A protein has these predicted regions:
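Bacterial N-terminal signal peptides that target proteins for export
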Residues: 7-19
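Residues at the start of alpha-helices and the adjacent loop-to-helix junctions
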Residues: 15, 29, 59-62
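Hydrophobic alpha-helical targeting segments used for export or membrane insertion
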Residues: 18-27
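C-terminal segment of classical bacterial N-terminal signal peptides
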Residues: 26-34
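A compositional/structural signature for long, glycine/proline-rich flexible linkers
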Residues: 38-503
Length: 503
């Protein structure tokens, strides 16, 4: 039947079945118990994103892959945890092995350059007087004192458990003398009167390093002592608003950890790495964006607790990763960026964030750098011909006139042996630079320094860094560097071989 407009007309007796059929079809499309399409919840934060499903089967290759990444990521954290544990055992501030300042929840200061027998950390320097300590801020916040250093360069570096520096305390920041409070991530107490500022760490475990410049004269060694005696870190409960004075020359001595290695004390054991990692991860919260990484690693650690074969694979992976991933970082060419003329330099030291490559590389080769605006580090193992430096040769390092490292603080060139430690020598000399008052400049105003096992000649010995008879490396420090160093405009000099190897 059609209407006058040509439309088809459905007879009344047929309408009801058609409507019923349409409803049934619509219902079948929507599904049981629903009336419209539903949107799955969209995660609004990392905690709402599902992680690996518990109990899922894991292949050996998968466990190796996760274990390898976890080893690279976690190596600096385990390193810090083991150093802090060693320091926590000392009853009071003192000297570890009679050499290294050691303290927990306080600080210990040296009164002179660090001894060449130091093996606690690689790449020490003899341009500053060191203070060092670890602390657990969950126990109690710490107060630290800043004396009036006058024109002298100084810097306090405060690091979290990842070796990221969370402080800006020093000469280059214009820090005022006074009392400062260092607190952990969960502290919500009241700030007592007399505190100049508060610094908050992202983690409860922190490392504290004080560096105060001293030149190599007897006069400056005497002049610095009253300043050193005013440096102090101590629990908030001991704060009374008065500057505490300490005679650091009377520190007790404690035995150093026993080590069979000739190099740095071994702070990471691959065979126990994955036994320690769960505890460390619980004490070091994930950075924003790291939540998925934590879940990924946790899932394999949980599986290893239930399956001996997975645990065995993780241990094997750690041992292999120590050799394949970590050991190569000890070569300077594998650290940072090329800085010119065969040298390398990091650009984000002590501000690593999620840069696991450079953080772990530095933790292996020269742990506890300062931030670039505090210190610029430039290093090499090779000469101008890309050949490994060797003390059997004599090398010259010439800075053209006006081209010594441009700094507002000071600069130095340090020589290290194959272990990135000092090479004991009869001159008791390990670095040359601003601190040295007897450097001899060339007639054209340039400065040539020498490195090698044998003297370059009596007339050049003031400019000579004695080297071992084997491999060694060179290391430039530029404290409070000018922009030309920070942006790479200034280039370090070539290391030129002057004579062939001795028979």
């Amino acid at each position: 039947m059609e209407s006058c407009r040509g439309e088809k007309i459905v007879k009344p007796e047929l309408r009801k079945p058609l409507v019923l059929a349409a409803a049934l079809i619509a219902g079948s499309l929507q599904g049981p118990g629903t009336t419209q399409a539903q949107q799955a919840p969209i995660p609004t934060n990392a905690a709402e994103v599902p992680g690996p499903a518990p109990g899922t089967a894991m292949t050996k290759a998968y466990v190796q892959m996760v274990g390898r990444m976890a080893y690279l990521w976690g190596w600096p954290l385990i390193n810090v945890a083991n150093r802090a544990a060693a320091f926590s055992k000392v009853p009071e501030p003192g000297l570890l092995g009679g050499v290294v300042p050691v303290a927990f929840n306080r600080i210990a200061m040296l009164t002179d350059y660090i001894s060449p027998g130091e093996h606690f950390v690689t790449c020490p320097n003899q341009d500053v007087v060191y203070g060092f300590a670890y602390a657990d801020l969950d126990r109690e916040p710490l107060v630290f004192q800043v004396p009036d250093f006058g024109a002298r360069f100084w810097v306090y570096a405060l690091y979290d458990a990842r070796t990221d520096e969370f402080s800006k305390i020093g000469k280059q920041y214009g820090t005022k003398p006074g009392f400062y409070l260092m607190v952990g991530p969960n502290w919500n107490g009241e700030t007592p009167a007399g505190i100049t500022a508060i610094l908050r760490s992202f983690t409860s475990v922190v490392t504290m390093g004080a560096r105060v410049f001293m030149d190599d004269t007897a006069e400056d060694h005497k002049a610095i002592q009253p300043l050193l005696s005013q440096i102090g870190f101590y629990p908030l409960s001991q704060f009374d608003g008065k500057m505490k004075i300490t005679d650091w020359s009377k520190l007790p001595h404690f035995p150093a950890p026993v080590s069979k290695d000739k190099g740095e004390t071994k702070w990471v054991n691959p065979e126990t790495f994955f036994d320690q990692l769960p505890t460390v991860m619980q004490s070091v919260p994930p950075l924003p964006g790291e939540e998925a990484l934590y879940k990924w690693i946790d899932s394999v650690l949980d599986a290893a607790n239930k399956n001996p074969e997975i645990k065995k694979t993780l241990t094997e992976t750690a041992i292999a990763s120590e050799h394949e991933l970590i050991d190569p970082f000890f070569q300077w060419r594998n650290n940072g960026r090329p800085a010119g003329n065969g040298w390398n330099s990091p650009v984000n030291n002590a501000a690593w964030g999620t840069d696991y490559l450079n953080r772990t590389g530095t933790a292996k080769s020269n742990m506890y750098d300062n931030k670039p605006e505090e210190t610029k580090y430039i290093y090499t193992d090779d000469d101008a011909q890309n050949k490994q430096l060797n003390g059997k040769n004599l090398y010259s390092i010439t800075f053209p006139k006006g081209q010594t490292p441009p700094v507002k603080g000071f600069w130095s060139l340090t020589l290290y042996n194959e272990f990135h430690l000092f090479n004991p020598n009869s001159l008791n000399r390990y670095s040359l630079g601003t601190k040295n008052k007897t450097l001899k400049y060339n007639s054209d105003g340039s400065l040539t320094l020498y490195a090698g096992a044998k003297s370059p000649g009596r007339d050049k010995e003031d400019n000579w860094l004695p080297a071992p008879n084997g491999t060694f490396s060179l290391y430039i420090r530029a404290y409070w560097a000018d922009q030309a160093i920070l942006d790479g405009t200034w280039k370090p000099p070539l290391v030129a071989q002057m004579q062939r190897a001795q028979p």
